[in-house]
């Protein structure tokens, strides 16, 4: 699986950080909001690590949604 594909664990982690959401590992194998949402209980250790990597990377960049 490519890290930066829309819906990937990395992408979902970065998006959760961007929108100021809590860390809640998940991903969408068929693209964001397409098909089934895979939650942490069903993710591999590598998928969970990719989610946290995306979240942490966005936190380091400080790239957040401006709601104003």
Model-derived features: where do they sit?
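Intrinsic-disorder/low-complexity detector
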Residues: 1-68
């Amino acid at each position: 699986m490519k890290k930066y594909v829309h819906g990937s664990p990395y992408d979902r982690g970065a998006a959760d950080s961007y929108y100021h959401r809590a860390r809640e590992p998940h991903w969408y194998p068929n693209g964001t909001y397409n098909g089934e949402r895979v939650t942490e209980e069903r993710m591999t250790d590598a998928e969970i690590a990719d989610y946290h990597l995306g979240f942490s990377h966005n936190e380091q960049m400080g790239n957040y949604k401006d709601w104003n």
